[in-house]
Amino acid sequence: MENKIKVVFCGTPKIGADVLKALIEMNEVEVVLVISQPDKPIGRKKQIVYTPVKKLALENNLKVVQPNKIGEIYDDLAKLEFDFLITCAFGQFIPTKILKLAKTDSINFHGSLLPKLRGGAPIQYAIKNGDKKTGITIMQMVKQMDAGDYYVQESIDILDSDDSGSLFEKMGQLAYSMCKKYLVDIYNHKFELIKQNENEVTFCKNISSEEEKIDWNNTSLDIFNLIRSLSPSPISYTTINSQRYKIKSSKIINLDNQNKNVAPGTIIDINRQGIVVKTLDSSLLILEIQKEGKKMILASNYYLNKLSDLKISDKFD
């Protein structure tokens, strides 16, 4: 290709960096600017950590800007010549006047099979909902969030062993391969755009801190899926006597008949595998648990090391 495809890329977390990596590796593409969310302090020491997209961009000598709102740099973008504005997990609303600056199109790599799961947390919600499949949609960006026509979709399976960390990894690999496979054809207008079916639209707002709390009156499957969807971060939690415990992983097990009348949330066993808690319909084996102010540990430590802050018959709120 004589003239390279000029791209302005917007992204922030690791999945965004996966798409940027594909763009950097493509001989047909020149990344003229990278836009990422401002760096944030991380951890107890509040150290400023570069976003994964910024880190990759700097390693490849690309220009990076980090506006609080992308509208602040409209004038600078208007002076640039670029074919595509490409986003993946950027985390900011992009005004229509910026979308219109791209000569070919402004496109987004969205982490669901649209029209399902429009919104900011599609990967987490796919697990939380118990979906067996999800995927990446390469779509046109329009004013309404995730409502544009799309060029192409590819799907992957969600395994029972997946949590949001492993699914983000798989989705990043899928987005990477789709970028390499389809971008040049999109540039050369080889795709017919597909309209989303408005009758099948579902939404996924960002998960609130209240929704991170486990409700033991739900089924084991619902709780199991919630825990997976919030692992490895921010991690679901439960409380007992105002003490918070984070629960990172679990397993569904069936109850003996003798426990059918036990209230949901009650600890019914502590054994070599972990801590068994009654749910609405069966029971859940907690595998990894973290008491507030302590480190995450295997729940089996409560049996092996005779830890005393949780006991059989204690009841989580």
UniProtKB/Swiss-Prot annotation:
Enzyme class: transferase
Keyword Cytoplasm: no
Signal sequence segment: none
GO function terms (MF aspect): methionyl-tRNA formyltransferase activity
EC number: 2.1.2.9
Residues where (6S)-5,6,7,8-tetrahydrofolate binds: S112, L113, L114, P115
Database matches in Pfam families: Formyl_trans_C (PF02911), Formyl_trans_N (PF00551)
GO terms for cellular component: cytosol
Keyword terms: Protein biosynthesis, Transferase
Transmembrane region(s): none
Database matches in InterPro entries: Fmt, Formyl_trans_C, Formyl_transf_N, Formyl_transf_N_sf, Formyl_transferase-like_C_sf, GART_AS, Met-tRNA-FMT_C, Met-tRNA-FMT_N
Catalytic activity, as annotated: L-methionyl-tRNA(fMet) + (6R)-10-formyltetrahydrofolate = N-formyl-L-methionyl-tRNA(fMet) + (6S)-5,6,7,8-tetrahydrofolate + H(+)
Classification via SUPFAM superfamilies: FMT C-terminal domain-like, Formyltransferase
Family under the similarity heading: Belongs to the Fmt family.
Job description of the protein: Attaches a formyl group to the free amino group of methionyl-tRNA(fMet). The formyl group appears to play a dual role in the initiator identity of N-formylmethionyl-tRNA by promoting its recognition by IF2 and preventing the misappropriation of this tRNA by the elongation apparatus.
Annotated PANTHER family: METHIONYL-TRNA FORMYLTRANSFERASE, METHIONYL-TRNA FORMYLTRANSFERASE, MITOCHONDRIAL
UniProt protein name: Methionyl-tRNA formyltransferase
Lineage: Bacteria, Bacillati, Mycoplasmatota, Mollicutes, Mycoplasmataceae
